[in-house]
Design a protein with these regions (language model features):
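Mobile active-site "lid"/loop adjacent to the S-adenosyl-L-methionine
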Residues: 94-117
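S-adenosyl-L-methionine
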Residues: 1-20, 34, 38, 56-89
Length: 184
């Protein structure tokens, strides 16, 4: 079976650099926040967003216990307000849409904030930077987010962005990924 998580990291690694700025737009339990922190190193910076205080608290505990560097800022706010906090161009951004693993499945990312958040991420992205957007179509809002993002990514100018979609086509409810690289 394809290991989509491994493919995700293989895509992002060439774009991550020591001293770079990275954003985890959907903090959750802090898995991506921790990984990004390790990759950008002591002189880099990671910003992580979540609207749920529970997610921020879990991630804070995890980072305190496991992060090798104090190079992160955890923000309890919507990812669509990222530009209020992140001022430098970013080398990598990650979105894991859906709901907090182990949390209330009634609280999910929403099209109304996901679309402006992704648009903000695209403007923050440095040349040769990369975004990864994981979509979970197994619930209605996830399916609708995926459709909206397909429209957005299909409309991006090819000279400025390269966009791929990694999907297991015979498993329609399986998570899939958009991989975006800024060309210029």
């Amino acid at each position: 079976m394809l290991n989509l998580r491994q493919t995700e990291k293989e895509f992002l690694l060439p774009h991550l650099m020591r001293g770079g700025v990275a954003v985890d737009f959907t903090m959750g339990n802090g898995n991506d926040t921790l990984w990004l922190s390790e990759q950008v190193g002591q002189t880099g910076r990671v910003y992580a967003f979540d609207i749920q205080p529970e997610a921020v608290a879990r991630t804070a505990e995890r980072m305190k216990a496991e992060a090798p560097f104090e190079n992160y800022t955890l923000i309890c706010d919507s990812h669509h307000r990222a530009a209020d906090y992140v001022k430098a161009p970013i080398c990598v951004g990650i979105f894991n849409l859906g709901f907090l693993p182990g949390g209330d499945k009634g609280i999910t990312t929403l099209r109304e904030t996901t679309l402006p958040a992704v648009q903000t991420a695209l403007t923050l992205l440095a040349p040769k930077g990369a975004l990864l957007v994981a979509v979970y179509p197994g619930h209605e809002e996830g399916r609708l987010e995926g459709e909206l993002l397909q429209e957005l990514f299909s409309s991006l100018p090819q000279k400025q962005y390269s966009v791929a979609c990694l999907r297991i086509v015979n498993a329609p409810d399986c998570p899939f990924f958009y991989l975006i690289e800024k060309n210029k």
